[in-house]
Amino acid sequence: MPKAKGKTRRQKFGYNVNRKRLNRNARRKAAPRIECSHIRHAWDHTKSVRQNLAEMGLAMDPNKAVPLRKKKVKAMEVDTEERPRDLVRKPYVVNDLEAEASLPEKKGNTLSRDLIDYVRYMVENHGEDYKAMARDEKNYYQDTPKQIRNKINVYKRFYPTEWQAFIDSLQSKKMEVD
């Protein structure tokens, strides 16, 4: 197939263009990804941020949502008519957010599998003898007896039920051997 007629020029690099500003402006103009899934699914891209949040029953500006009372000016009963509230068209968003906020928070901090195995090995082989644990060949990081004791205490604090089950299993093993 023949080529389309016309001038074909190679692309020239625009030296006078500020790439940093160009990228910054492109990032600023690009719509951000909304992290909250409830808000993201109810979002209407044809409307402004203020309109979207008003439809969901959320406030864009917290200062305007809950205005502070003026101390000096006392309004008369005639002036204190209820302001017409914006119509909340998507109340399920607020309900979902409230339900999610009422859930208990997950424990984010856990111990590494290596540390758990290390503590279990040391207690299984040496019991409460921290000096023997410090001399053990599996003590790769050359922890002192106090450091080992602290690691064991951390394990006890993080996993109390597992620790109790582990100690019970050790005692049952000792009884079988005796």
Swiss-Prot record:
Transmembrane stretches, start-end: none
GO terms for cellular component: nucleolus; nucleoplasm
Cross-link position per record: Glycyl lysine isopeptide (Lys-Gly) (interchain with G-Cter in SUMO2): K74
Subcellular location(s) of the protein: Nucleus, Nucleolus
Residue ranges that the Swiss-Prot or TrEMBL entry lists as coiled coil: none
Pfam name, any one: Nop16
Effect of K7R: In strain: NOD
Tree of life domain: Eukaryota
Phosphothreonine sites (modified residues): T8, T144
Residues with PTM N6-acetyllysine: K90
Annotated region described as Disordered, given as residue ranges: 1-30
Coarse class of the protein's main subcellular location: nucleus
Keyword Transmembrane helix: no
Keywords noted in UniProt: Acetylation, Isopeptide bond, Nucleus, Phosphoprotein, Ubl conjugation
Family according to the record: Belongs to the NOP16 family.
PANTHER family given in the database record: HSPC111 PROTEIN-RELATED, NUCLEOLAR PROTEIN 16
Protein name per the record: Nucleolar protein 16
Organism: Mus musculus
Gene label: Nop16
